Amino acid sequence: MIKLAGNFLITTVIESLGEAFAFGHKFGVDPHTFLDILTNSLFTAPIYRNYGSMIASDKFEPAGFKLPLGLKDNRLLLAAAEEAAVPMPMASLVHDRFVVALAQGLGEADWSAIARTSYQNAGLRKEVTE
């Protein structure tokens, strides 16, 4: 359960980064500048630097942890949470992000590719660029 909870936390960071980058992009902020400011001030942990760099560069291959594996862990987490009657709305949101990314052909990509859906939802990218 701890591994699932840890992976859940990572996916929520990825989701949050995707939304934040899309927000910044809408206001004309260069993604690399955005990343530099974030990771040199409030968010200095490696997880923000590493996943933020992938999102800023829109490069999700080679995958460190493939998207289908993230979906698998997310499903296991949601099943365990349901069994224990623990609502996890963020996990449900992330689940949908995984499904969308897989539907767009990102099965070989790093699980951080779910961040692309935030860009697409903001009208910034209409198609997957590989």
Task: Describe the residue ranges of each PLM region.
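Helical "substrate-binding/catalytic lid" subdomain
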Residues: 2-122
